[in-house]
Amino acid sequence: MGEENQPNYTISQENWSLHRKGYDDQQRHQEKVQEAIKNNLPDLVTEESIVMSNGKDVVKIPIRSLDEYKIRYNYDKNKHVGQGNGDSKVGDVVARDGSGGQKQKGPGKGQGAGDAAGEDYYEAEVSILELEQAFFKELELPNLKRKEMDENKIEHVEFNDIRKTGLWGNIDKKRTMISAYKRNAMRGKASFHPIHQEDLKFRTWNEVLKPDSKAVVLAMMDTSGSMGIWEKYMARSFFFWMTRFLRTKYETVDIEFIAHHTEAKVVPEEEFFSKGESGGTICSSVYKKALELIDNKYSPDRYNIYPFHFSDGDNLTSDNARCVKLVEELMKKCNMFGYGEVNQYNRHSTLMSAYKNIKDENFRYYILKQKADVFHAMKSFFKEESGEKMA
């Protein structure tokens, strides 16, 4: 063959699976991020970048159990062949830290100043939707009952019809295979193949109106001078996730925001989450305001009612008996009453000492001592009921 007839192309014999390496690594990294989010959820929900994000779609949060990529050296100088014991997986750490297994003093921990380098952590971009899906998975409004079934209805889509034509995304694979099998069997060869046009079955939806129950949540927060920056941040973190949970899972839930010190007032949502107050503390004022709202706007015959009150427990001692009486009056009209107390140092609480005598099963309380308790308080107040759900 002459030079003029030589082919002007070459056949590549490289391993094409290597071209997917970057994609596979990216998928593995995303799986690690999701696993880290799940394992660190109690700490992540109170990250300031999330609570102060005003509900932005994507936020950057530190995930301390997820390391940044780096080369690690094996300090063991012994000669060896291969690595591991045969059961290693892609991504496993095989290097040793050279400490000989001895526990060393960590940087920035314990008493006294340290001279070691700080601990690096990975800052991942996470969508609020991802956190919500992991967080709200097992939450629901407790004791939810039907109210005004004939008046309050919502649109609902149901796949309740089968047709021979439709969108390919709505094809009913099971019914299509059964139809093909029956047709082929009638012709003497029972088989799922071939599938003809006449065998195709598509699911079709209809919009129906379904009865739904109304509910209102009364978010009550102590904004007095005894509520410091940390206490207010914890309370607002809880109410931030509570409002997102309610608006994500329920279409017909109203939320009223009430702030109080010695006096209580209904405030806009933005002011509730941003404005500071001062002064003394008379908690009975906020319960009176809640009862006033119920009497004027939210009849128990029409609404499921859920009051939630957050405070540091530092209340005027002479007001405690009045608070207990008003809480008991509220519980007669409400499905559940929730009290959250931010008490980081386990100090004596005048309000909690009075509330511990309330024996009603619809009264729930939770003491928050650290940031992770916001997650646990949500789980405690909105835990799924073991019995039957609302029909």
Curated annotation (Swiss-Prot):
Biased composition (Polar residues): 1-16
Disordered: annotated segments: 1-31, 80-117
Basic and acidic residues bias (residue ranges): 21-31
InterPro entries listed in its UniProt record: Spore_YhbH (IPR014230), UPF0229 (IPR006698)
Pfam family, one: DUF444
Biased composition (Gly residues): 98-115
Family: Belongs to the UPF0229 family.
HAMAP family listed in its UniProt record: UPF0229
NCBIfam families registered for this protein in UniProt: spore_yhbH (TIGR02877)
Protein name, entry field: UPF0229 protein BCQ_0617
Originating organism: Bacillus cereus (strain Q1)
